[in-house]
Amino acid sequence: MIRFSVLILCLLICVGCGPQQVTVEDHQSTPAHIELQPPVTIESFVRRGEPFESTYTAVPERVVAMWQNSIETIIALGEGDRIVAGMGIPDRKYVRPEYREAYDTIPYKDLKYANLESVLMMKPDLLVGWKSTFTNKMLQTPTFWQARQANVYIAESSLGAQSALTMDMEYKYIRDLGGIFNRNMEAERLIQEMQQSVAYTVAQTANEKPPKALFIEVEGKHFRLYGHKTLAGNIGDSLHADVIDTETPSISMEDVIEQNPDVIFLIVSDGEYSQADVIMNYVLTQPGLQGVNALRNKRVHFLPLLAVYSPGIRLLDGIDIVSHGLYPNLYPEGVPDLIH
């Protein structure tokens, strides 16, 4: 079975296909010029332990946004008309329905990155992306862009797994973009919606035994494990699940049987959506797993990677899917399906 993990997908998009030369016909009307008084200074990181600061004297007007978290979070803040290029979304059908109209107005949209020359011609004043975006082999470093009067913001959760990934990182991401775009109230509203969703679930299930939850991704004949230090695991912990974890990055079939999870969340990337049912069937038909509670009670659910890896606004989807999967009595409508 082919596994398109986030790393492989990044390599496919960013290296295998390579940045491409593009011509952008910008038919957007010029967004309003908004001065920021006082100026806003935001800290971001090139890598763990290597911070850099960006100062904004006005709301950015020509934004190049890489990956779904950047594009959709900026749209959710009400500033989609400031995006001149949105890269990294395979198909508009993966965009939240309420964001598609704004997404459609972005002048340049593609799964592939435009090359450096093309991005320079877009004259951006802000670039938002992941750590992998801003290297000498890709779209250059933050220093390169700051020398050209353009700021860079890198999602902290894309820096790597040297430390735990948490919901608080995503709240900071949304809050930082809210400050950059002078949309602080909107950012807090989005964050509060997520926090209230968690608080409601926790309050309503306070007297229940924590369900044992397993977060996995299929890797050939093995399972990659998403434990406490991953965002998926952090969501589970925050919702008072008993999250299965080990000292290794994978979990064997034998260990799954021994742990006997009540619910399994099957993580799939957008590159795997067309094979999602095949992947699910692979798990459901494993002879050794037939006695596991999650399979016996039909509690194996898809969890899209976009909701648990540097998700930004899509963290709400991750919270909803996990809470519905953990507590079916509280949410009898079933687990949201973002894949089909």
Describe each PLM feature range:
Residues 55, 113-126, 139, 252-260:
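Short helices/loops that flank or line small-molecule/ion binding pockets
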Residues 5-14:
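Bacterial N-terminal signal peptides
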